[in-house]
Design a protein with these regions (language model features):
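Conserved SAM-binding loop of SAM-dependent methyltransferases across substrates and taxa
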Residues: 127-140
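Conserved class I S-adenosyl-L-methionine
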Residues: 117-126
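Conserved SAM-binding motif I beta-strand of class I
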Residues: 142-147
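Conserved Class I SAM-dependent methyltransferase catalytic core
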Residues: 97, 223-280
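S-adenosyl-L-methionine
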Residues: 157-190
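Class I SAM-dependent transferase core
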Residues: 75-116
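Mobile active-site "lid"/loop adjacent to the S-adenosyl-L-methionine
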Residues: 200-229
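SAM/dcSAM-binding transferase cores
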Residues: 279-330
């Protein structure tokens, strides 16, 4: 039972029976144990009993009970934290360990352009931080959160509900490198998106040692073909003239521009500096599908002032929901 965790604890036989029936109905295997015992015999309602489910089934089991109005009976999910972003405008549930969202996701959302009623795909969405931040800023935009990791997809779905974005935002499980047929199977039809936003894995495996956490390693470490694969997927998804917005490490800018050609043009490059006069650590690039216009560079965003305090510009974006120049059409 090393791969099982406690879903809830109770000594009410009616509640325990109802929970068992709900889990059985959902096809979720579970065990019922006395709190301090390794037996499945009852304890006459004196000692609380534990309902255990496998790690892989925990998110689904919690959702079943939440949908049944039993969220208050659930044990706290110690594997997940709930954190505020955009100064509390959105809240996001994410793994306590492993891949967690950061400033990059919020900066990406602040740089993404979209019009009323348009569809934007957040490719490699994780728990949905960037796409949900975009949807919170633009009330008429529809967003699809596309993510390969099933656990992160489940958390993204929770975050959609947590931020009351059902109907405008949805989450699908799919690999960014999937075929056009596989993308279509989850509702991502070729040539239909007005925008694609993405924060691909970008750490160089020859420089950065991969995390022992598999999900974190997949989210952070790039393969040799990662960038080209993701850009190819974006090109397939975008409608003619659609906009791609990508955040990447600054020392890889030339690789990024090379992979954008010849399918994207009108690239606008926005360097992100950690402090004044320091080398850029990130670039955000916006480009237009099938445009032949040459690239331009925009004024840099400086995250911290000379005293290492957050700059006013960064605070406006990260806490107040301000946008970057890339969010406006060229």
């Amino acid at each position: 039972m090393s791969d099982m965790r406690e879903l809830l604890r109770a000594n009410d036989p009616v509640l325990l029976s109802a929970v068992g029936a709900l889990l059985d109905g959902a096809g979720i295997p579970h065990l019922l144990l006395d709190q301090n015992m390794s037996v499945m015999e009852g304890s006459l309602g004196i000692i609380a009993r534990r309902v255990l489910v496998h790690d892989d089934d925990m998110r689904a089991a919690r959702r079943v009970l939440e949908d049944a109005g039993l969220a208050h009976e659930l044990r706290p999910d110690t594997e997940v934290t709930e954190d505020a972003a955009l100064g509390g405008r959105i809240r996001l549930r994410q793994p306590r360990k492993g891949h967690r969202f950061g400033h990059d996701a919020i900066l990406l959302a602040a740089a993404t352009q979209a019009g009323a009623g348009e569809q934007v795909v957040d490719l490699g969405a994780g728990v949905g931080a960037a796409g949900i931040a975009l949807a919170a800023r633009l009330a008429d935009v529809r967003v699809t959160l596309a993510e390969i990791d099933s656990r992160l997809v489940e958390l993204a779905e929770e975050n959609i509900r947590l931020n009351e974005l059902e109907g405008r935002v949805n989450a699908v499980q799919v690999d960014a490198g999937a075929s056009a047929w596989a993308l279509s199977a989850v509702g991502l039809e070729a040539g239909t998106a007005a925008g694609v936003m993405m924060n691909p894995p970008f750490n160089d495996p020859t420089v950065h040692r991969a995390s022992p956490d598999a999900a974190r390693a997949r989210a952070h470490v790039a393969r040799a073909d990662t960038l080209a694969t993701w850009i190819g997927a974006a090109h397939r998804l975008l409608a003619p003239g659609g906009a791609l917005t990508v955040i990447w490490r600054a020392d890889g800018l030339q690789d990024l521009l090379g992979d954008l050609e010849p399918d994207f043009g009108a690239a606008r490059i926005l360097p992100i500096l950690p402090r004044p006069r320091a080398p850029a650590i990130r670039v955000i690039v916006g480009a237009i599908k099938d445009s032949g216009t040459p690239p331009t560079t925009l004024p840099s965003l400086v995250l911290n002032d000379a005293d290492n305090r957050p700059s006013a510009a960064a605070e406006a974006i990260l806490r107040e929901g301000a946008t970057l120049p890339l969010a406006a059409p060229a």
